[in-house]
UniProtKB/Swiss-Prot annotation:
Residues 417-452 form the UVR domain. This is Negative regulator of genetic competence ClpC/MecB. The gene is clpC. Competence gene repressor; required for cell growth at high temperature. Negative regulator of comK expression. May interact with MecA to negatively regulate comK. Residues 80-144 are annotated as: Repeat 2. PROSITE patterns: CLP_R, CLPAB_1, CLPAB_2, UVR. Residues 163-410 are annotated as: I. One of its GO terms (biological process) is establishment of competence for transformation. Pfam families: AAA, AAA_2, AAA_lid_9, Clp_N, ClpB_D2-small. GO terms for molecular function: ATP binding; ATP hydrolysis activity. Keywords: ATP-binding, Chaperone, Competence, Nucleotide-binding, Repeat, Repressor, Transcription, Transcription regulation. Residues 471-662 are annotated as: II. It comes from Bacillus subtilis (strain 168). Belongs to the ClpA/ClpB family. ClpC subfamily. It comes from the Bacteria.
Length: 810
């Protein structure tokens, strides 16, 4: 027998019937055993109907035993009697008549009643229950159950049982006031009503980006139908939202899906008052279409064209283009309605309308300023999502954050609970070691602490009830910061001091470049104070000048001062992009090429860390096409990668370093320490470098840069400071080996003298330290002349470096 359509409870009833037959020692399963199985199952509609008729398990069992008695012999196999088989067939027929796609316990009981001649029917009659009365009881329970379980509470539900089991009735949910209010979408809802009122092809499809409120428009229509704010033609319509996943789920055999969908369509056609809403309309394409079977879209096409089926679809622009537009026959049956992202003002109104729901859920109050901040900050900083969805999510998470914060146990209560646990453990230990006096004393302490805990907890909860937690602008800003990594919360005093002293912080790393340090510090302050142009990067700079004067070092120092770690800087070495074909690696390989799925080396890094210092080192080494890519980054703070995603550069500091003009300077000997007039020297050098820059880069590229900074040549006084910095780095490395080092002024001057080079800036100093300090120390360490815990002094005697060691003083 086929039990595939039987519900779990119905299958349980048949299993219980078999158990009853075995218990009573009968060789066959008859109608009486099925009746016993129905009453023993206890939870289905059939069991409830029998209980309502006053028929309990014991009552029926006694009557069955008195009618047919107990058997003696047990056979190996047990079969259904012809009457029992007929009952199961009739139960399937009853399910079909009621329009149900399943066979439940109620259908089995109706089959028993309809059979009318078996032992079960005699049992019911003997217990004073007429078959007609039993049938009425089942149908009554079945009707109330359908009304309660389906979304709608209207009389038309009986006409659409399959649809009710697969779809949600939005009009019924709207009637219960369970839908969120729909604000500012009257124009789109009006367009939907106009299309629905057409004679044929009355199927609107809502097309828009994810999160702009497409589903909300269908909910808005349901609310208008309930409020009688629609034309006569749409009065008393039911908006049912159908999930294609539910329709496909459980269709194990070929033809089941088509049968289910045809039933839904027949019910809609017969009811005549159903508007079907299919969210994610593109799921129609291919749904249920395996191995030559036709899919859902092809089954629906004829009804959609003739106007027999009113359907509202919703899908994104990308999915519409990818799936619907490819099928011209399906596309012509739908009328597209564009749903645009609401403006900032409209989004604020939407959030104000939703405020009550979120306040009730989180038990907090949300200020007007918080709503405004949620919309404006999400619009500015969360660029890869759409309003109002992203602003609603901000409010939701901020509400959750504030609510959880008020539930945190205060520290004094935690401390008391900890003490109470310790005293309990001590008391138990004292009892076990039979120190009863100590245990009695500890018991008194425990009692006192328990009272303190209860009092503290009570006062905390009372205070909690009186406090009305509030979601403020700061809470919204904190959530934005946690999402994006961009600091938008109110500036703390410690950060204020840091921002005001940024020049000093940078000067401690970069020596002799006042102009560059001041320009960068000003850009950071401008951004953090909220005064920068919101449509452009925080700052874009070109650092020019001879090699070894601190161009890259300043970018590293800036990253460390802002993020606390110079490794958080995004560094792209432009010498890797010298060939024309390599430029595409910045934004990602085009389709069909290796690396398409990996994303761009620049765009992916900025997507992951939108608030960062981006260093494009040695920019003049790159292919000229790279500068064309950078034009829109510099002007609009955005760049589109190979997959069409827009990457936001508005919270980055863009630094490009270049050695343009260095060769010209070398020829003219402008770099050095022998020129008397330093100001004139720098001015001449700047003019030369700017001339070279204009020849190397196109005007539209140079014109978009915020500031072009020409680094000064290093002076002799700077070299000693740089030696001190480099020796500090050596000190850190030696500290790991439990050693400390000190360079005397004479040693520093000697290193500076050895590392002076008129053309190469500070890098020769690094080589001088390697040669005269690090090499000497490594030899002494290997010889065993320097031991752990010693303090090393590097000095100069008779023009030579000498290493002295002493015991380290703490």
């Amino acid at each position: 027998m086929m039990f595939g359509r039987f519900t779990e409870r119905a299958q349980k009833v048949l299993a219980l019937a078999q158990e009853e037959a075995l218990r009573l020692g009968h060789n066959n399963i008859g109608t009486e055993h099925i009746l016993l199985g129905l009453v023993r199952e206890g939870e289905g509609i059939a069991a409830k109907a029998l209980q309502a008729l006053g028929l309990g398990s014991e009552k029926i069992q006694k009557e069955v035993e008195s009618l047919i008695g107990r058997g003696q012999e047990m056979s190996q196999t047990i079969h259904y009697t012809p009457r029992a088989k007929k009952v199961i067939e009739l139960s399937m027929d009853e399910a079909r008549k009621l329009g149900h796609s399943y066979v439940g316990t109620e259908h089995i009981l109706l089959g028993l009643i309809r059979e009318g001649e078996g032992v079960a029917a005699r049992v019911l009659n003997n217990l004073g229950v007429s078959l007609n009365k039993a049938r009425q009881q089942v149908l009554q329970l079945l009707g109330s159950n359908e009304t309660g379980s389906s979304a709608a509470g209207t009389n038309s539900n009986a006409n659409t049982p399959t649809l009710d089991s697969l779809a949600r009735d939005l009009t019924a949910i709207a009637k219960e006031d369970s839908l969120d209010p729909v604000i500012g979408r009257s124009k789109e809802i009006q367009r939907v009503i106009e299309v629905l009122s057409r004679r044929t092809k009355n199927n609107p499809v809502l097309i828009g980006e994810p999160g702009v409120g497409k589903t909300a428009i269908a909910e808005g229509l349901a609310q208008q139908i309930i409020n009688n704010e629609v034309p006569e033609i749409l009065r008393d319509k039911r908006v049912m939202t159908l999930d294609m996943g539910t329709v496909v789920a459980g269709t194990k055999y070929r033809g089941e899906f088509e049968d289910r969908l045809k039933k839904v369509m027949d019910e809609i056609r017969q009811a005549g008052n159903i508007i079907l809403f299919i969210d994610e309309l593109h799921t129609l394409i291919g749904a249920g279409g395996a191995e030559g079977a036709i899919d859902a879209s092809n089954i629906l096409k004829p009804s959609l064209a003739r106007g027999e089926l009113q359907c509202i679809g919703a899908t994104t622009l990308d999915e519409y283009r990818k799936y619907i537009e490819k099928d011209a026959a399906l596309e012509r049956r739908f009328q597209p309605i564009q749903v645009d992202q609401p403006s900032v003002d409209e989004s604020i109104q939407i959030l104000q309308g939703l405020r009550d729901r979120y306040e009730a859920h989180h038990r907090v109050s949300i200020t007007d300023d918080a709503i405004e901040a949620a919309v404006k900050l999400s619009d500015r900083y969360i660029s890869d999502r759409f309003l109002p969805d992203k602003a609603i999510d901000l409010i939701d998470e901020a509400g959750s954050k504030v609510r959880l914060r008020s539930f945190t146990t205060p520290p004094n209560l935690k401390e008391l609970e900890q003490k109470l646990d310790e005293v309990r453990k001590e008391k138990d230990a004292a009892v076990q070691s039979q120190e009863f006096e100590k245990a009695a004393s500890l018991r008194d302490t425990e009692q006192r602490l328990r009272e303190q805990v209860e009092d503290t907890k009570k006062s905390w909860k009372e205070k909690q009830g009186q406090e009305n937690s509030e979601v403020t602008v700061d809470d919204i800003a904190m959530v934005v910061s946690s999402w994006t990594g961009v600091p938008v919360s109110k500036i703390a005093q410690t950060e204020t001091d840091k921002l005001l002293n940024m020049e000093n912080i940078l000067h401690s790393r970069v020596i002799g470049q006042d102009e560059a340090v001041v320009a960068v510090a000003k850009a950071v302050r401008r951004a953090r104070a909220g005064l920068k142009d919101p449509k452009r990067p925080i700052g874009s700079f070109i650092f020019l000048g001879p090699t070894g004067v601190g161009k890259t070092e300043l970018a590293r120092a800036l990253a460390e001062s802002i993020f606390g770690d110079e490794e958080s800087m995004i560094r792209i070495d432009m010498s890797e992009y010298m060939e024309k074909h390599s430029t595409s690696r910045l934004v990602g390989s085009p389709p069909g090429y290796v690396g398409y799925d990996e994303g761009g080396q620049l765009t992916e890094k900025v997507r992951r860390k939108p608030y960062s210092v981006v260093l494009l080192d040695e920019i003049e080494k790159a292919h000229p096409d790279v500068f064309n890519i950078l034009l829109q980054v510099l002007e609009d703070g955005r760049l589109t990668d190979s997959k069409g995603r827009t990457v936001d550069f508005r919270n980055t500091i863009l630094i490009m370093t270049s050695n343009v003009g260095a060769s010209e300077l070398k020829r003219n000997k402008y770099v050095g320490f022998n020129v008397q007039d330093e100001t004139q020297n720098h001015k001449d050098m700047k003019d030369k470098v700017m001339g070279e820059l204009k020849r190397a880069f196109r005007p539209e590229f140079i014109n978009r840069i915020d500031e072009i900074i020409v680094f000064h040549s290093l002076e002799k006084k700077h070299l000693t400071e740089i030696v001190s910095l480099m020796s500090d780095q050596l000190t850190k490395r030696l500290k790991e080996q439990d050693l400390s080092i000190e360079l005397t002024d004479a040693a520093k001057a000697k290193v500076a003298e050895e590392g002076v080079d008129l053309e190469y800036g500070a890098r020769p100093l690094r080589r001088a330290i390697q040669k005269h300090v690090e090499d000497r120390l490594s030899e002494e360490l290997l010889r065993g002349n320097i031991h752990k815990g010693q303090h090393i002094v590097l000095d100069v005697e008779d023009g030579e470096f000498v290493v002295k060691t002493t015991a380290k003083t703490n």
